Amino acid sequence: MAKMLRVGKITNTHGIKGDLKVLPLTDYFERFEELEWVYIEGFKDKFYIENIKYKPTLVILSFEGYGDINLVEKFKDRYLLIDESQRRILPEDTYYIADIIGLDVFTVKDEYIGKVVDIIQTGSSEVYVIRMNNLKEIMIPSVKEFMPEISLEKKRITIDPIEGMIE
């Protein structure tokens, strides 16, 4: 089976006509308009998107054939998934979170630091959480000054930390 990517989390129902509140896991809410269908975590079938509405922090979705709250209750707290073929092409130096998590991190002197275990969205930029061999976690801002190279092909990130950043 193709690698599945999370694009949203169903947080609750909305009204009685089968609408679902979805917390997008993307900066580009309109992304859902590009999708004809999605998977729902734990279900094998494709769910065809019938209607999309936007709230400031949520997307309201409905699926074909699911026009009743009783049919969609079971979807609460599950992730919306797409397969890799539905991925958007991202601009240069922009990455999917799923592609960054798990990458090895080295300094510019080729010293192994650890693995990326999480990414925190701060508004202006992202902060990568790196778990070191001693299980200590450090945070490195995802800016060129501290992160001169991200290579998905090599499955590694090169950082140029300032004094005290990785201690």
Curated annotation (Swiss-Prot):
SUPFAM superfamilies: PRC-barrel domain (SSF50346), Translation proteins (SSF50447). The keyword Cytoplasm applies. Its main location: cytoplasm. It is found in: Cytoplasm. One of its GO terms (molecular function) is ribosome binding. Keywords: Chaperone, Cytoplasm, Ribosome biogenesis, rRNA processing. Pfam families: PRC, RimM. GO terms for cellular component: cytoplasm; ribosome. Residues 92-165 form the PRC barrel domain. One of its GO terms (biological process) is rRNA processing. Belongs to the RimM family. An accessory protein needed during the final step in the assembly of 30S ribosomal subunit, possibly for assembly of the head region. Essential for efficient processing of 16S rRNA. May be needed both before and after RbfA during the maturation of 16S rRNA. It has affinity for free ribosomal 30S subunits but not for 70S ribosomes. HAMAP family: Ribosome_mat_RimM (MF_00014). Binds ribosomal protein uS19. The PRC barrel domain binds ribosomal protein uS19. This is Ribosome maturation factor RimM. It comes from Alkaliphilus oremlandii (strain OhILAs). The gene is rimM.
